Amino acid sequence: MEKLLMHTLWSLAQALAELQGQPGADALRVGGVLGIELKLVKENAHVRFYENESPLRLAGGVIAGKLDIREFKAAGKAPFIIISQLGGTCIGMEELQRRIGALTPPTPPSNPVPDALITRQGRLGKVRVSLGFRWSDPDCLASITPHID
């Protein structure tokens, strides 16, 4: 079952970047703030991998199939967050340029298979974001990763 969030993709990315920058940010806190349950799916000596259990329906008809949070075990290191498997309403270049402005030139994948990502970067307000586009569907945004600077 999909979880309905009142966020737009843009406000979600900005909120996640804000959370990343706060001391003590972790997957439990992210899930609590968003009101979603995150499940530990994998762990190694350095990182815990969390994901949402069901797709997130965002404002504007956008669906985030996966919220991937990588929580580092090293003290004081901010989690890495990826909003991926974007579906529903296609977010194309026109909207991206309206929301984000100038983007870096595309970086093609080293191995162009259908699931490979073409990446670009830009700024959403004060937040630096990486944008991923599927090789098989380069006109629609497939993922967004907020970064703290």
Where on the chain are the PLM-derived regions?
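Short, exposed beta-strand-loop hairpins at the edges of beta-sheets
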Residues: 121-139
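Short helix/turn-capping signatures at newly exposed starts of structured segments
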Residues: 1-107, 111, 137-140, 145-149
